Amino acid sequence: KNRPTFCNLLPETGRCNALIPAFYYNSHLHKCQKFNYGGCGGNANNFKTIDECQRTCAAKYGRSS
């Protein structure tokens, strides 16, 4: 199973001006990081919690443990 492709997207604040704490997966650093979401628009690399981000994007895909 492969990591979802949206995990590679850069964080997008979106069109609105709210400052909602959110998390995105940084594919270069291989970890989830905080960013401010504007409240609308953006892309799928946007999670309400760091746990949700890690479960979706930071899990070990395609590697044997």
From Swiss-Prot:
Disulphide-bridged cysteine pairs: C7-C57, C16-C40, C32-C53
Keyword Disulfide bond applies: yes
Pfam families: Kunitz_BPTI
Site positions for Reactive bond for chymotrypsin: N17, A18
Tissue: Expressed by the venom gland.
InterPro entries cross-referenced by the UniProt entry: Kunitz_BPTI, Kunitz_BPTI_sf, Prtase_inh_Kunz-CS, TFPI/VKTCI-like
Record keyword Secreted present: yes
Molecular function terms, GO-annotated: potassium channel regulator activity; serine-type endopeptidase inhibitor activity; toxin activity
Location of this chain's protein in the cell: Secreted
Keywords assigned by UniProt, alphabetized: Disulfide bond, Ion channel impairing toxin, Potassium channel impairing toxin, Protease inhibitor, Secreted, Serine protease inhibitor, Toxin, Voltage-gated potassium channel impairing toxin
Coiled coil: none
Gene Ontology cellular component annotations, sorted alphabetically: extracellular space
Position of the signal peptide: none
Listed PROSITE patterns: BPTI_KUNITZ_1, BPTI_KUNITZ_2
Domain BPTI/Kunitz inhibitor: 7-57
Family: Belongs to the venom Kunitz-type family.
Role description: Dual-function toxin that inhibits both serine proteases (high activity on chymotrypsin (Ki = 18 nM), and low activity on elastase) and voltage-gated potassium channels Kv1.3/KCNA3 (IC(50) = 120.0 nM).
Misc. remarks from the entry: Negative results: does not show inhibitory effect on trypsin.
Name the record gives this protein: Kunitz-type serine protease inhibitor IX
Biological classification of the source: Eukaryota, Metazoa, Chordata, Craniata, Vertebrata
